[in-house]
Amino acid sequence: MAWASNISDTCIILFMKGKSMDKYLEASKRLINFLDTNPSPFHVIAALGKMYEKAGFKRLLEKERFDIKKGESYYVTRNNSSIIAFKIPKKDFKGFNITAAHSDSPTFKIKANAEITVEKNFVKLNVEKYGGMLMAPWFDRPLGIAGRVMVKSGTKIEEHLLHIDRDIIMMPNLAIHMNREANDGYKYNAQTDTQPIFAEIGSDVTLYDIIAKELGISKSAILDTDLFLTNRVKGTVWGANNEFIAAGRLDDLQCVFAGAESIIEAENKDNIALHCVFDNEEVGSGTKQGAASTFLKDVLIRVNKALGGDEESYLQAVARSFMVSADNAHSVHPNYTEKADPCNRPVVNKGVVIKYNANQKYTTDAVSGAVFRDICAEAEVPVQTFTNRSDVAGGSTLGNISNTQVSLNAVDIGMAQWAMHSPYESGGVKDTYYLEAAMKKFFETDISGKLY
């Protein structure tokens, strides 16, 4: 499963070692390289497209007719921040085997007209929270900027990816001498406390000047931007025996990456395999490129029709389909063991986590849980279970949201991790391998032979 784009020198060395390299470490190194080189959802989707094309997938455009054939593989994007890849078997298909993950993570977005002058000495950037984050870890660390820039080019408007890959801004904390409450549950204000320092006044360099220089364009050609702050600390393998990994955006790019590698490697004979990566999960999914949109439904209908099906055959195929909604889960934290449910206590490095919720925040029920457990057993992948404590409300994720558009059996899963929604998260070195093995087996499984 070595399809990651922009392979680093470190990863090349790992691949050259071949069978001598630990399979778990190898998968984790590929994931870390993917995270380090793709700092925004737009970079992630572009990288996935390159991975798919390298593996023989053909790109489709929503604005054009879907011309597809049996035995071929394709992908389609929306907003350049969501992507659906799919592989069609050589014979008539029975249903759809679908995995879903999301491309976005909590961060700060740079507002329009962002530069603010302070005390006639400094320039700050006006930013706003994106998603529900742990705010404190963003302070006192060098930050970069990444996203997309819309540029006027002749009579056309072009999209350019931007990654300012240097230490360009920072949010310094207020010294303990001026904030004696800092270690007593201080509540950060999202407007006043989190404006990163950008420059000294008198430097005569604006944010748009830097953007224009990075992209090699005229500043006057910049029409608009979607830009986010990025944590510049690289991913790493750590622990006494290299048992753990740490990186930004493990939630949910671990599932994004594992699904992409798995669908490339899978040999699906009975069902159409699809890997969906939606945007905006962290802010409710209610966008044209989110899980609540018609993106998945539109693709399924068009694929079925392009293969000669009608509305009735589409509904039959959906009834024989299954979704794995993959969004990371909370590991028991060694310093906060009381925060976990007393009976369902997943930990890092112990396998895929199946998530349950009595109030239907997750899609898993006895049927879908049984199917996925059986698939994991066949893949020789260990399984754990997660539920919230009964006095803690849980959030919903991709499965239930997408089921409002395409109703089918689904299971919610993820990999156990610590510090979810921090700019730097931790997990187990074995878990990317486990997830890839489980997803590959899922793509290759005839669900109708198990259940319907």
Predicted features and spans:
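N-terminal hydrophobic/helix-forming segments and targeting peptides
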Residues: M1-Y452
